[in-house]
């Protein structure tokens, strides 16, 4: 056994929780995702699902998925840069941009990789990234990869956000990154006030709509639409694994 294996050989905390019957992870579901699911041979209520609109078991979605698989197969067999861009990708990106109310969209394999990829692509050394201290872990990873100066403010505290903006060089790029709906707290970002501060300090705004898309706004256009600030938000991220009953993510702007 090597050093890596030795490191974890005595780690038995999960087993301790399992023995007490309180280990909450990797519970196996034996049915489709619905308000009730089958688990360990029993029907139980589902309180943890992100399928906010129930589309994961909608027959129209299932039929469209089957039709697409029969036409295109189960994979793209290449990256988007080379041979992995399908006509339905281009069509989807156009429709996403139109739906949210922006010019362009770009799809990713997951919502997590949107934040990991886009944030370091748009800010870097010499720039500032200002985040709510309750932002999602994918935003945390994205900002770490960016090599920009990282500033954090107390959750939804607009006075604290303004103080962080005042620390930034006036002529530097300043990107405020915030969850539209905070996944742990369940509250909304104060986007109207964030937009006001953006304009005052010549900053830009990136909103993670993972939990807002499909739920808030006109026809589910998200928290930005809910507050009427879509035009003032520079980049909007969304994920397909929640309301949209699939897998993947996108950024629109």
List each model region and its residues.
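Conserved N-terminal alpha-helix of the aminotransferase class I/II PLP-enzyme fold
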Residues: 63, 67-111
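Conserved PLP-anchoring active-site segment centered on the Schiff-base-forming lysine
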Residues: 118-137
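N-terminal "arm"/small-domain region of PLP-dependent enzymes with the aminotransferase-like
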Residues: 5-74, 203
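Short, structured coil segments at secondary-structure junctions
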Residues: 101, 125, 145-147, 201, ...
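Active-site phosphate-binding strand-loop segment of PLP-dependent enzymes
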Residues: 151, 155-207
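Active-site PLP attachment segment
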Residues: 225-253
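Short, small-residue-enriched loops and turns at beta-alpha junctions
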Residues: 54-55, 82-85, 137, 158-159, ...
């Amino acid at each position: 056994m090597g050093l890596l294996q030795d490191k974890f050989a005595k780690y038995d905390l999960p087993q301790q929780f399992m023995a007490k019957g309180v280990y909450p992870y990797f519970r196996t579901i034996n049915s489709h995702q619905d308000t009730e699911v089958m688990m360990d041979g029993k029907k139980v209520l589902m309180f943890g699902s992100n399928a906010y609109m129930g589309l994961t078991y909608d027959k129209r979605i299932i039929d469209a998925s089957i039709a697409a698989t029969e036409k295109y197969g189960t994979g793209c067999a290449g990256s988007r840069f080379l041979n992995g861009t399908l006509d339905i990708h281009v069509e989807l990106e156009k429709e996403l941009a139109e739906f949210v109310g922006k010019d362009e969209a770009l799809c990713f394999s997951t919502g997590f990789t949107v934040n990991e990829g886009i944030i370091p692509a748009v800010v870097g050394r010499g720039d500032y990234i200002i985040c709510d201290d309750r932002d999602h872990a994918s935003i945390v990873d994205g900002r770490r990869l960016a090599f920009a100066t990282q500033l954090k403010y107390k959750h939804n505290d607009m006075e604290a956000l303004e103080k962080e903006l005042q620390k930034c060089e006036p002529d530097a790029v300043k990107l405020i990154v915030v969850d539209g709906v905070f996944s742990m707290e369940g509250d909304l970002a104060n986007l109207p006030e964030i937009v006001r501060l953006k304009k005052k300090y010549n900053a830009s705004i990136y909103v993670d709509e993972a939990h807002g898309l499909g739920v808030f706004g006109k026809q589910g256009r998200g928290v930005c639409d809910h507050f009427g600030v879509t035009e003032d938000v520079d980049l909007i991220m969304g994920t397909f694994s929640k309301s949209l009953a699939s897998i993947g993510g996108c950024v629109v702007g």
